[in-house]
């Protein structure tokens, strides 16, 4: 296939680490804030979480005049319509990407976590970057490291593959946990040759957002 844009995948074989949420956040940031032409390919069969979220949002907009007004204001401010979200079976990821790459600056892929799924490893080595969210949980950590190790072993067989880097990043950071814990994990990652982003994402479920009816 002829790749004419940047391919970025978020992938981890452990569920609940925020993979789909981060895909949406990154796509929205680059599309609406940075002005890039972005598309998302939801490959996480069978749940297709991002496509389900988009369908729910569209129904909410259809039922709400205030949301319609907000959408119009956003378009007036940014000149950007909603970015496309397509679903794809694991074996047709690159075929779907080929249809979108000519009109996009960045394609984001929400990949399934099972690397044994046919076509997934081939898709991963054709990415430019793979971001793997990790959380401070022993079982999740073991699963994440096993996942990355499998990818690295496979990539070594294809030295000419487009994939540049696999990068880990901390998600759902619990502010109550000592930073020494995260520093210790980062040292382990570094010793085994894994790169970790310095930017971390907090656990928003621990942040109480004040509401007009809620006392401080």
Where are the regions a protein language model picked out?
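Walker A (P-loop) phosphate-binding motif
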Residues: 2-32
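P-loop/Walker-type NTP enzyme "switch/lid" segment
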Residues: 11-17, 32-108, 114
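Ser/Thr-centric signal marking residues that sit
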Residues: 20-22, 171, 213-214
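Short, well-ordered alpha-helices that flank and scaffold nucleotide-derived cofactor binding pockets
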Residues: 24, 28-32, 55, 125, ...
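Conserved catalytic-core segment of NTP-binding enzymes
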Residues: 39, 112-199
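Short aromatic-enriched loop/helix-cap "lid" or pocket-rim segments at secondary-structure transitions
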Residues: 50-54, 179-182, 210
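Short, glycine-rich, amphipathic interfacial segments at transmembrane boundaries or analogous
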Residues: 202-206
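Single conserved hydrophobic/aromatic residue that forms the stacking wall/gate
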Residues: 207-216
